[in-house]
Amino acid sequence: VVVRDPSVRRQLGDLCEPTVRLYAAQVAAGEAPFNSVVPTSVDMAAARRTASAAGEPPMFQRLDAVPVVLVVSVDLAVVASVDKDMDRVGLVSGGSVYPLVWNILLAARAEGYGGVITTLVVPAEEQVKELLGLPSTHAVAALVPLGRPVRQLTRLRRRAVEEFVTVDRFDGLPLVAATE
């Protein structure tokens, strides 16, 4: 859904704020936010109500000023959920949507626009579905603000591949060392 109405974009930003607060509280507590393996020690209800000391990220407070916001959804009635019966959080059902979103961002960049993939609106999915008239079988996958950046980012800093890619097994040799 391409959201052009500033008041709807503002409402989407408002829906993100409690999740942003919880995310910040979990980071401040030294946790991996929204981890499905290790339970949080953060009082979630209090964190959602309380602004962090660092303040809210301005992106969500000013979504109404962004030229366009995309809300990407996945129709769960048509995706293959091959991991639906596993005893863990499902990952496969909407996995193919993120390459689509990435391609949208690449196309936008080629036209001089910038954007970001965020999933911080997902916990408010029911309100988003009502706000945008999404069908009941759809799940919200991403919120993507798009606009003209003040400056285009260039080279990003990333970990070296050999720090996280191994050969043959998770505990195998780093990719570079194994190929020498």
List each language-model region with its residue ranges.
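Generic alpha-helical structural context detector
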Residues: 13-17, 106, 142-145
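Solvent-exposed alpha-helices and their adjacent loops that cap or buttress functional pockets
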Residues: 61-64, 110, 132-136, 157-158
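Generic beta-strand structural signal
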Residues: 66-69, 111, 140-142
